[in-house]
């Protein structure tokens, strides 16, 4: 909004010229979202605590100490993140940019699904929540709209025919595999998979939000690079007109994440719930699809992939062979069962997220 107000005045007022710079507006979005999370965090947590009573239900068959230590902690803290992200983005981004709206659409849509899931868990005091099939149908419907919207946007901006339905292979120069209509299925799987992978990761205080911020920072940089002709040509990556504005959304996400972490740091005063984890994961997946770096998401978000795969392996192994591969899934609970302290798991997973992010950034140069 501020961009549309001040950018046209740049020729007459030197200060207004700052609003033409994506980096300046990203900083503004980050600070705005962070302040919102700081200021509204305490009253929102108090309101959630009063409304929810017993808070988020804790799995009785899970980690024993969680039943005692985490019982009564309110959930739906994702509202705080979404508030900061939305206000920060809408205030500082170019609202004529389609990619901004695509990411906002998925973030909000997945947030609604997550809210329904959280609401059912809290009101019924069960860990079951929203039915898995209904949940997936809703997620795939939202993801399909986003993928179609993104490919249409790419075509309207004049990308080379076929690029909009192609997959870029990291570490290989100009290697784009056009999979045609299958891209719509692939894109949906990326977005839905990302949303649920982050959701699986959100099981310990601070575990999910920091890797999400790290991934957002990484993809913000990549979006900025592919959104500039000069950088894209120098690094020999495909150019995506308008993608640079996604950096502003990423900045808002990081700012809101920092503010949320203030309240989610151990011992957590609030959990983000599915309201936050599904929406943030969906946002990361959508960004990856929009800037044609879907496979890089598997690297940068490798921690999320590991968490999701651990659950899939656990379920498949038990159904097929009647045996569990892990002591408990997702895998962070496996390490808890082995006796690792919660802060040890969280910090080590953060370190892994940083390493994977650096590898993901290296794909820009190593080709």
From Swiss-Prot:
GO terms for biological process: cell division; cell wall organization; peptidoglycan biosynthetic process; regulation of cell shape. It comes from the Bacteria. One of its GO terms (molecular function) is UDP-N-acetylmuramoyl-L-alanyl-D-glutamyl-meso-2,6-diaminopimelyl-D-alanyl-D-alanine:undecaprenyl-phosphate transferase activity. It is found in: Cell inner membrane. The chain crosses the membrane at residues 28-48, 75-95, 96-116, 134-154, 175-195, 206-226, 243-263, 271-291, 295-315, 344-364. Its cofactor is Mg(2+). This is Phospho-N-acetylmuramoyl-pentapeptide-transferase. It comes from Maricaulis maris (strain MCS10).
């Amino acid at each position: 909004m501020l961009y549309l107000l001040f950018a046209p005045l740049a020729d007459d007022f030197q200060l207004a010229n700052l609003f033409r710079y994506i980096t300046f507006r990203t900083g503004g979005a980050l600070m705005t979202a962070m302040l919102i999370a700081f200021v509204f965090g305490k009253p929102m947590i108090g309101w959630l605590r009063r409304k929810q009573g017993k808070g988020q239900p804790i799995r009785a068959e899970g980690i024993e100490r969680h039943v005692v230590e985490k019982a009564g902690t309110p959930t739906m803290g994702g509202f705080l993140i979404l508030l900061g992200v939305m206000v920060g983005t809408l205030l500082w981004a170019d609202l004529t940019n389609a990619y901004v709206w695509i990411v906002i659409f998925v973030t909000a849509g997945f947030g609604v699904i997550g809210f329904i899931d959280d609401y059912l868990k809290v009101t019924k005091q069960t860990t079951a929540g929203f039915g898995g099939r209904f949940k997936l149908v809703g997620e795939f419907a939202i993801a399909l709209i986003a993928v179609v919207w993104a490919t249409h946007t790419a075509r309207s901006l004049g990308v080379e025919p076929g690029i909009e339905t192609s997959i870029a292979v990291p570490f290989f120069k100009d290697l784009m595999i056009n999979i045609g209509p299958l891209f719509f299925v692939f894109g949906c799987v990326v977005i839905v998979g990302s949303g649920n992978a982050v959701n699986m990761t959100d099981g310990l205080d601070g575990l999910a939000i920091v890797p999400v911020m790290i991934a957002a920072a990484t993809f913000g940089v990549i979006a900025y690079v592919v959104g500039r002709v000069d950088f894209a040509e120098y690094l020999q990556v495909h150019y995506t007109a308008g993608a640079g504005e996604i950096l502003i959304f990423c900045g808002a996400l990081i700012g809101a994440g920092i503010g949320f972490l203030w309240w989610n740091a151990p011992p957590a005063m609030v959990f983000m719930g599915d309201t936050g984890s599904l929406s943030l994961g969906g946002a990361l997946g959508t960004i990856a699809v929009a800037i044609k770096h879907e496979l890089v998401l598997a690297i940068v978000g490798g921690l999320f992939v590991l968490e999701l795969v651990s659950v899939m392996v656990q379920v498949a192994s038990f159904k097929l062979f009647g045996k569990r591969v892990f002591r408990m899934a997702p895998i962070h609970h496996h390490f808890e069962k082995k006796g690792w302290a919660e802060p040890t798991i969280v910090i080590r997973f953060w370190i892994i997220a940083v390493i994977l992010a650096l590898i993901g950034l290296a794909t820009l140069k190593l080709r």
